């Protein structure tokens, strides 16, 4: 019974911390993908203290608890990314202390990575962590995977990717990735 009470108390504490972070974040960012304008302004220094970060034990990495997913940016009527609004959202998130940005090869019909690359080119590369994903369904061989990886570096305009994930991974795809040598190549 005591451990159940402790676990509930611990869970409530975690939820309250996340509510505080989100509350501080939502006060100055408008997250809208349809209609209206999104003109978020950077937070004051006082608001930045609300973003919590965690250190990764075995690496010199410190990521924000809140990451920014780049799958659903605001779009224009023709379906393309509304770059002014989306850039304002990314800049606001970064100013609020978010330092983990996640995109992928197929997001926004292949336009998320190039757009994110144009935005992050204006930032100090050491101020954020970038994640993207290998589209395993496009890989028939290790050479395909290497070509796609190099293409992603170019699309993002970076020399390295901090977190490289395998997209839509399930057991069969993982086994295929292992068989083609992709898993071993990624661990090098």
Model-derived features with residue positions:
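Active-site beta-loop-alpha junctions enriched in small/polar residues
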Residues: 71-73, 104-106, 133-137, 166-169
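N-terminal binding-site loop/beta-alpha segment at the start of enzyme catalytic domains
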Residues: 33, 45-128
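Residue-identity detector for glycine
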Residues: 13, 35-36
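Glycine/proline-rich, positively charged
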Residues: 77, 139-188
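Short, positively charged and aromatic/hydrophobic N-terminal segments
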Residues: 28-30, 37, 41, 47
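Extreme N-terminal basic, low-complexity initiation segments
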Residues: 2-14
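Short hydrophobic alpha-helical segments enriched in small aliphatic residues
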Residues: 4-7, 19, 24, 29
């Amino acid at each position: 019974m005591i451990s159940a009470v402790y676990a509930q108390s611990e869970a409530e504490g975690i939820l309250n911390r996340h509510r505080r972070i989100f509350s501080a974040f939502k006060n100055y960012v408008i997250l809208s993908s349809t209609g209206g304008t999104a003109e978020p302004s950077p937070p004051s220094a006082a608001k930045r203290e609300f973003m919590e970060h965690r250190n990764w034990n075995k690496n010199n990495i410190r990521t924000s608890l809140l990451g920014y997913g780049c799958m659903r940016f605001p779009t224009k009527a023709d379906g393309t990314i509304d770059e002014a609004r989306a850039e304002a959202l990314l800049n606001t998130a970064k100013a609020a202390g978010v330092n983990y940005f996640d995109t992928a090869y197929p997001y926004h019909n292949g336009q998320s990575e190039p757009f994110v690359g144009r935005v992050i080119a204006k930032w100090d590369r050491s101020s954020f962590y970038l994640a993207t994903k290998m589209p395993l369904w496009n890989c028939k061989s290790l050479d395909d995977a290497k070509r796609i990886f190099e293409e992603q570096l170019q699309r993002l305009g970076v020399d390295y990717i901090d977190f490289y994930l395998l997209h839509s991974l399930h057991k069969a795809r993982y086994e295929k990735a292992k068989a083609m040598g992709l898993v071993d190549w990624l661990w090098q």
